A protein has these predicted regions:
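N-terminal binding-site loop/beta-alpha segment at the start of enzyme catalytic domains
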Residues: 1-37
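Glycine/proline-rich, positively charged
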Residues: 5, 45-140, 150-151
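Short, hinge-like loop/turn segments at secondary-structure boundaries
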Residues: 29-31, 56-58, 118-122, 142-146, ...
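Conserved, mostly hydrophobic/aromatic
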Residues: 3, 11, 26, 39, ...
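Conserved short secondary-structure transition element at the edge of the structured enzyme core
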Residues: 5, 94, 118, 157-158, ...
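Glycine-rich, positively charged active-site loop/lid region within alpha/beta enzyme cores that binds
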Residues: 146-211
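Glycine-rich beta-alpha junction loops
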Residues: 108, 130-134, 156-167, 226
């Protein structure tokens, strides 16, 4: 609720966060201002068959204490379920008024190809990891989304706080946050088995910090401003 009081109007959650607890918290916190906010949540990847998807949507509606979901997203692709069937079910949910729009999350070009072939199935948005230090989407999926007018919603925009400027070295980062490929696989919470790029990552962070200082702006603001100017970012 404090975020709303500071001007935030889009709230994104998922049933996977705390087994529905996050949805229930969002629903309770925003109940009195529901008509002034946009609520987005996600369909679990294991529940993308039409019947299961509709049941998952109903659970989210109940958790969120709302009559409709503004943006209902597929959390991750699932190659075992025919994506056309999933999108047909999403269209039905939209027609029934249970969702206002549907989107996807973590979808690549191959995942989205069937949607382009059927205009009714084109998602409103694709939620992707994107920030100054993680720009993999720029190779293929970002241009694809721009071409097909699919908005990009960014998660990890400050890379677990690294782009806030509060950490001066890899050792300053809490272990549970030091788990991306930027960090050595020797860090306890990593799972990638790669050497990482800690020196390079923090050298880049130092340069961003210097640029922010020259602009007399917080490093987080500079990082987010850069992101907002990227093609396709909503």
């Amino acid at each position: 609720r404090a975020a709303y009081e500071e001007g935030v109007t889009l709230f994104d959650t998922a049933p996977a966060y705390g087994d529905g607890a996050a949805e229930r918290l969002v629903g309770e916190a925003l109940a009195s201002v529901r008509d002034r906010v946009v609520i987005a949540t996600k369909a679990p990847s294991e529940e993308l068959a039409p019947k299961a998807l509709k049941a998952a949507c109903d659970r989210s509606l109940e958790n969120l204490k709302t009559e409709h979901i503004d943006l209902y997203q597929i959390h991750w692709p699932n190659s075992k379920i025919k994506i056309e069937d999933t999108f047909a079910a999403l269209v039905e949910l939209r027609s029934a008024g249970k969702i206002r729009a549907f989107g996807v999350s973590n979808f690549g070009v191959k995942d989205l190809a069937p949607c382009v072939a059927q205009p009714d199935y084109l998602p409103a948005a694709n939620q992707l990891a994107y920030n100054l230090l993680f720009r993999a989407i720029e190779y293929e999926i970002q241009p694809f989304c721009v071409k097909h007018n699919i908005a990009i919603l960014c998660y990890s925009p400050l890379l677990h706080g690294l782009l806030s400027g509060k950490f001066l070295s890899a050792d300053d980062v809490p272990p549970e946050r030091a788990r991306t490929r930027h960090f050595s696989s020797k860090r306890p919470h990593t799972r990638h088995g790669e050497p990482g790029a800690e020196a390079e990552t923090f050298a880049a962070i130092d340069e961003i910090r210097k640029a922010a200082r020259e602009l007399d702006e917080p490093m987080a603001s500079v990082s987010l401003s850069w992101l907002l100017m990227r093609p396709g970012v909503a």
